[in-house]
Amino acid sequence: GLVGSEMCIRDSPYWDWERWEKEIDRMALYGVNMPLATVASEAIAERVWLRMGLNKEEIREFFTAPAHLPWHRMGNLNKWDGPLSDAWQQNQIALQHQILTRMRELGMQPIAPAFAGFVPEGFVQKHPDTQFRHMRWGGFDEEYNAYVLPPDSPFFEEIGKLFVEEWEKEFGENTYYLSDSFNEMELPIDKEDKEAKYKLLAEYGETIYKSIAAGNPDAVWVTQGWTFGYQHSFLS
């Protein structure tokens, strides 16, 4: 299939249905049949984190303002200019229903968001025995950077399963799910230790796939190619 949509279109979180309809029709015209469908990711995430024991305040402080959501969804940035309002979340759910209906009418296979391991700070504080990794990105202060679960944490599969289940409960069955754990971020290991690098990548890959399949055994994991170009010297 031909995948469409760029994760980092800065103004796309502000698109209304009229703008989205034009975009979807344009993608169809160019033969795109696997468009990204990440609208309302935060509304689904909020439901998951509530089920994992966080309160609304702990969850809301995790999200950025709308303009920065593409980077939040890739695990690069938290909190910046946030939070998101209840009205925003509700509107995004309604918009995503319209988007998915149109995509499916045109025979497209939407790529939905899946869990990549990034967790709110409130979750970190509730689980002091878990060895979270604190990532860095773009020169932002540490308070805005992501915490990521280790691949051997039992929470990973539990949370990943909930993400898929909550998404499909709201939007219907889906096949393709996007998850990227290290977009423009260094792996938390010695760069010279190739054995450790490949081992960690394999562990995250296996855990991400298992977490998606736990929610939908027929799901297909999709990942972006950008990371492999941006960090080619390290990942080669």
Enumerate the predicted regions with their spans.
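N-terminal carbohydrate-binding accessory modules
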Residues: 1
